[in-house]
Swiss-Prot record:
It comes from Batrachocottus nikolskii. This is Rhodopsin. GO terms for biological process: absorption of visible light; G protein-coupled opsin signaling pathway; visual perception. Residues 33-44, 105-123, 196-223, 280-289 are cytoplasmic. Its main location: membrane. Keywords: Cell projection, Chromophore, Disulfide bond, G-protein coupled receptor, Glycoprotein, Lipoprotein, Membrane, Palmitate, Phosphoprotein, Photoreceptor protein, Receptor, Retinal protein, Sensory transduction, Transducer, Transmembrane, Transmembrane helix, Vision.
Length: 289
C-alpha cells in the first residue's frame, strides 16, 4: 500500500457514494427529458449531453476506481487503465465542451450578435457533434501512442502521464496541446461569452427592451448555466493546476495524496450538474412530479 488501508477504504466509500447518487440523478435527467415532449428543446439537448457525459464517468470510471480501491492498487492491467483513463477524460471533456456550446448559445440568444438568429434543433445537433469531436480529440491520442494513460495518485485511477521524464519519451507536446486547446481556449470562450452576457442583461434591464417575463426566463437559464460553469471550475481547476505543476516540475518529490485529492475532487460534476438542472428548472421539476 502507498498509503494506509483506511485511506483506500475511504476512497472506495467515496466512489460508492458518487455512484449511488450520480447514476440515478443522471439517468432520471435523461428519462424525464426524453419522456416529456415539451422538455425536448434544442437547449435541453446540450444539457442531456452533460448527463450522458456524467454517465460515462460514473459507469466507465467510478465503478473501476471503487473496485481497484478495494485492492489497494490498479488491478485491471494496461487495458483496464486505458479504458478507465479514456472514459474519465472523455466524460470531463464532453462536459467542458458542452458548457462552451451553452455559453455560445446564451451569448447569441441574449446578446443577439446575429440578428434574427434562433437556436434550432439543427444547431443543437451541431453543438453535440462538436463537443464529441473535441472530447475524442483529447481522449483518443493517449490510446494510439501520443502520450499514454497511467495509474496516478494512490494508483486506483488512471490519467494522462504528466510525470515521466525519460530519454526518447516525449510528453511535452501532448500536455501543451491539451492545456491550450482543451483547457485555456474553452475557458476563454466561456469567460468572453458570459462577460458579454452580463453586460447585455444589464443594458436590456436598463432600457426595458424586452418584456419582464422574457427577461426573467433568460436570466433564469443564464443563471443555471453560469452556476454549472462555476461548479466545473471549482472542481477541475485544482486538478489542472496540480497536473501543470507536476509537468513543469518533473522529477520533484510528491506523495500519492498530492494528486489523488484534486483527481477525486474533479469527479463531483457527475453529481452536481444534474442536481443544478433539476433544482433550477421549474418545468423539469413539474414533469418529474
Amino acid at each position: 500500500y502507498l498509503v494506509s488501508p483506511a485511506a483506500y477504504a475511504a476512497l472506495g466509500a467515496y466512489m460508492f457514494l458518487l455512484i449511488l447518487i450520480g447514476f440515478p440523478v443522471n439517468f432520471l435527467t435523461l428519462y424525464v427529458t426524453l419522456e416529456h415532449k415539451k422538455l425536448r428543446t434544442p437547449l435541453n439537448y446540450i444539457l442531456l449531453n452533460l448527463a450522458v457525459a456524467d454517465l460515462f464517468m460514473v459507469l466507465g470510471g467510478f465503478t473501476t476506481t471503487m473496485y481497484t480501491s478495494m485492492h489497494g492498487y490498479f488491478v485491471l492491467g494496461r487495458l483496464g487503465c486505458n479504458l478507465e483513463g479514456f472514459f474519465a477524460t472523455l466524460g470531463g471533456e464532453i462536459a467542458l465542451w458542452s458548457l462552451v456550446v451553452l455559453a455560445i448559445e446564451r451569448w447569441i440568444v441574449v446578446c443577439k450578435p446575429i440578428s434574427k438568429f434562433r437556436f434550432t434543433e439543427d444547431n443543437a445537433i451541431m453543438g453535440l457533434a462538436f463537443s464529441w469531436v473535441m472530447a475524442l480529440a483529447c481522449a483518443v491520442p493517449p490510446l494510439v501512442g501520443w502520450l499514454r494513460y497511467i495509474p496516478e495518485g494512490m494508483q486506483c485511477t488512471c490519467g494522462v502521464d504528466y510525470y515521466t521524464r525519460a530519454e526518447g519519451f516525449d510528453n511535452e507536446s501532448f500536455v501543451i496541446y491539451m492545456f491550450i486547446v482543451h483547457f485555456l481556449i474553452p475557458l476563454s470562450v466561456i469567460f468572453f461569452c458570459y462577460g458579454r452576457l452580463l453586460c447585455a442583461v444589464k443594458e436590456a434591464a436598463a432600457a426595458q427592451q424586452e418584456s419582464e417575463t422574457t427577461q426573467r426566463a433568460e436570466k433564469e437559464v443564464s443563471r443555471m448555466v453560469v452556476i454549472m460553469v462555476i461548479g466545473f471550475l471549482v472542481c477541475w481547476l485544482p486538478y489542472a493546476s496540480v497536473a501543470w505543476w507536476i509537468f513543469c516540475n518533473q522529477g520533484s518529490d510528491f506523495g500519492p495524496i498530492f494528486m489523488t485529492l484534486p483527481s477525486f475532487f474533479a469527479k463531483r460534476p457527475a453529481i452536481y450538474n444534474p442536481m443544478i438542472y433539476i433544482c433550477m428548472n421549474k418545468q423539469f421539476r413539474h414533469c418529474m412530479i
